[in-house]
A protein has these predicted regions:
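C-terminal and inter-domain tail/linker signature
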Residues: 1-343
Length: 343
């Protein structure tokens, strides 16, 4: 599938053509808790969602391998009529709001067979549209995709960092347009704490990326994180690493270490990795994270937990890399947390 063609078609607002040309008949579509099956359900949903709303994709980052595309998207929602009950906040005709989406497309025979999306709160961490996008013009093309080596699709259990954070309030109200736009929108197994981390590897072995060694380095990083081996997992960061959670931003390596050193006194984190796309520019992970209380944690940000209880949540995590080290981390929830359960 040509993702640039997909974006161009999406941005025309012709949902029937989009569904006909780019989605498999048995598409499984999930956006947060909403699940749709088949192209008939999908088209019905798009017709409803785009009643009075023009939706424009502005792709910020695209990673892909043979059968998957991961995209970080700033999505502009333009109101073509008053929408007081709009999902992402009330809009009047001529107003727009922007929402950051993290989307994983799984392909089969050149069409989207599975679609999974997570979002940040409106206007949080987004770029501003240029004048062409504001007027509803489709971008000429998507950003160049990073081609990656295929990774195993079978779930792999490993701990991972930075999956906490609660939804934030909108960063700013919708911006009014000078003129209206053109009219045309799993369960992870529980278990005992992970084994102790292995001895520190050489700097060459710590280089993250799309090679088999680079993906193994990512597993080493997550293993060190799960074992609270702060010296080891922090070696995978650049000095100026930036971690963007839905509710907070952590600047620099020492801030991330300090945040998790405090958290790990009461709550430990592990995950089931469902899919990973990797190249030398970045890593995109679709995971279910499990948070387990080792002491009572009544104020834990995901859910209040008693000692021995755990909670799970599906998330997308996107890491950008610089010289084989993590330079930035962005996290988005792909569903609501489970209710606390006991091991």
């Amino acid at each position: 599938m040509d993702f640039a063609d997909y974006i161009r078609t999406f941005n025309t607002g012709d949902d029937a053509v989009l569904v006909r040309d780019f989605y498999a008949p048995d598409i499984h579509f999930q956006s947060g808790p909403r699940i749709l099956r088949g192209t008939d359900e999908l088209l019905q949903f798009l017709n409803w969602a785009h009643d009075g709303i023009r939706e424009i994709i502005r792709a910020q980052t695209v990673l892909r391998d043979e059968n998957r595309i991961f995209a970080e998207i700033d999505m502009d929602f333009h109101a073509t009529k008053d929408k007081p009950d709009f999902t992402f906040g009330a809009l009047k005709k001529g107003e727009f709001t922007t929402v950051k989406f993290f989307v994983l497309y799984t392909l089969r025979d050149g069409r989207v067979a599975r679609f999974k999306a997570a979002t940040w709160p409106p206007n949080l961490g987004v770029t501003k549209p240029d004048s062409a996008a504001v007027l509803g013009a489709a971008p000429a093309q998507a950003p160049a995709a990073h081609l990656t080596q295929a990774t195993a699709t079978a779930p792999t259990r490993a701990p991972v960092a930075h999956l906490t954070g609660s939804p934030a309030t909108p960063a700013r109200p919708p911006a009014a347009l000078a003129s209206p736009p053109v009219t045309a929108p799993s369960q992870a197994p529980s278990g005992a704490p992970a084994q102790r981390a292995q001895p520190a590897r050489s700097s060459a072995a710590e280089r993250l990326g799309g090679t088999p060694e680079g993906r193994q380095a990512f597993m080493d990083y997550t293993r060190a994180f799960s074992n609270a081996d702060f010296d080891s997992f922090s070696r995978f960061y650049t000095d100026d690493v930036r971690c963007e959670l839905p509710s907070a931003v952590l600047e620099r390596r020492e801030a991330i270490v300090g945040f998790y050193r405090e958290m790990f006194k009461t709550v430990r984190e592990s995950l089931t990795l469902h899919q990973l796309i990797a190249d030398d520019a970045g890593l995109a992970a679709d995971v279910t994270s499990q948070f387990t209380a080792i002491e009572d944690a009544p104020h834990f940000v995901v859910a209040a937990l008693k000692k021995g209880e755990f909670v799970r949540v599906r998330v997308f995590v996107y890491y950008t890399l610089r010289d084989g080290k993590i330079a930035s981390i962005r996290v988005a929830r792909a569903g609501i947390p489970s209710k606390p359960q006991r091991l």
